[in-house]
Amino acid sequence: MEEEVAALVIDNGSGMCKAGFAGDDAPRAVFPSIVGRPRHHGIMIGMGQKDSYVGDEAQSKRGILTLRYPIEHGVVTNWDDMEKIWHHTFYNELRVAPEEHPVLLTEAPINPKSNREKMTQIVFETFNAPAFYVSIQAVLSLYASGRTTGIVLDSGDGVTHVVPIYEGFALPHAIARVDMAGRDLTDYLMKILAERGYTFSTTAEREIVRDIKEKLCYVALDFEQEIQTAAQSSSLEKSYELPDGQVITIGNERFRAPEALFQPSVLGLESGGIHVTTFNSIMKCDVDVRKDLYGNIVMSGGTTMYPGLSDRMQKEITALAPSSMKVKIIAPPERKYSVWIGGSILASLSTFQQMWISKQEYDESGPSIVHRKCF
């Protein structure tokens, strides 16, 4: 038995939960952050029906369940369900006893303070962890890309945020957060598919639309041009087979859905697109650091995985930036999990070991210690 106990790293996204051991290069467990409850009463006695299902099991039985995501826009809205997800992570996915390992969790920037305190409380009181730390997601993504300076555009399922970081410090006054991400794009795709005559209504059918989005959507370099191309020929059309064997065809919906990232007004949101948000964030930073930020725009999270997104981002930011400025978009291939990878790197650093909040410190100070130790 080695003397070092591996820390557990859990990146609780609004859509997927990524969990594993510090020092690994990829998460061991990746499963949907879903808790499902049966819609109907069981009639077969002795089937051992559960009153709730978590993750992949909820996903596979979705036809008879009502699916709920306990994390909305990066903030935990249902703590009972969240506890179920953590319980599932420790005991079923990682098969570890949480009282034996330090636990690193992640959160979105500009989250309510109470959210962090409650997280801390549950980890120490329900799961009896020996040590705990909570880190900001975008900062971890930057670690994973091997940089200490850059601006991270982190867009997942529930929240998108832009965080400028200089020499390892997030610049809090310039952090921008947009409550528009993958889930909103899925909803928007549901809506525009309905206009084509394909209706998806239940929580289970929404998962089908999410799959269509992940497999077929892309970002157009020139939106107007692409709309014309789609109208004139069927070259952009793709077909998708539904679980029951029916085949549907989708055309301009393929790029109209992700276009909402650049034109949130189609979702009825007032915020600027991700390119404008990134540019504004850079402009809020000191004039001396801007050059380094323009040259290190790091993509992170599942919603940045669309083909064509980096090129479009490059084009849009270059148009906004001063003409002589060198703009560089960094899109690491493993960016879907870069937050987790950054957490794995951080938790295994020898210099990090004195940063943990210990159970003893927690017992002395209570949950508010998280604001003093984690920033």
Curated annotation (Swiss-Prot):
Protein location: Cytoplasm, Cytoskeleton
Pfam families, alphabetized: Actin (PF00022)
UniProt keyword Cytoplasm present: yes
Cellular-component GO terms for this entry: actin cytoskeleton; cytoplasm
PROSITE patterns: ACTINS_1, ACTINS_2, ACTINS_ACT_LIKE
Reactions catalysed, as given in the entry: ATP + H2O = ADP + phosphate + H(+)
EC code(s) of this entry: 3.6.4.-
UniProt keyword terms in alphabetical order: ATP-binding, Cytoplasm, Cytoskeleton, Hydrolase, Nucleotide-binding
Classification via SMART domains: ACTIN
GO-annotated molecular function: ATP binding; hydrolase activity
Enzymatic class: hydrolase
Keyword Metal-binding assigned: no
Family to which this protein belongs: Belongs to the actin family.
Chain's role: Actins are highly conserved proteins that are involved in various types of cell motility and are ubiquitously expressed in all eukaryotic cells.
Designated name of the protein: Actin
